[in-house]
Amino acid sequence: MSEALKDNPEQEMICVDAFGGRTGRIIDRKTAHSTPGIKHLAIQVMVFNPQKELILHERPLKKVGGGVWDSPTTHVLNGETPSQAGVRCLKDEYGIASNEEEITVLGGFSYEKDYGDGSCENEFCLAAFAVYTGSIKPNGEHVIKLMNFPAKKVRDEIKAGSSKYPVWFVETTRIVAADFNGKKFFE
């Protein structure tokens, strides 16, 4: 069993169907991420600066799906709205104090990934983005290294088949780049 499944076992996840519709069921994090998993709600917030750069972090290997470049990602917990979850996640992972109005939540996507160690992903993930100009104080529990990457370069690497980004990041990039307000960062 993956050690990552011991992280935040008390989290109460919102179960959803393949289209993000709530089923009314609440489940603990360990059960949600133990193979084959139970579909639950998540959100990823891409953070851009005004120079059209994505602020990304290297995800620790000890985390489920670790060892890749990623944006802040979390579960929408029981009693939270997606925007509230995004605010919580930005504070927890990057030390960014934001409010719900600063996060643009777009559509979502359903995906599954089995890591072969008893842990998996089985989520409907909402794509979101925010623009940030202040200082970032990364949380070492979530961040090995923090770097700014030109957003266009990241999208080009994804199109070329790069494996340094997780599947949920690839899908979030697709959704944000297709959005009227999000696409300007990738031009």
Question: What is each stretch, according to the model?
Answer:
Residues V64-V68, N78, F109-K113, S119-E187:
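Nudix hydrolase/Nudix homology domain
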Residues H40-H75:
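A glycine-rich, hydrophobic loop/mini-helix early in the fold
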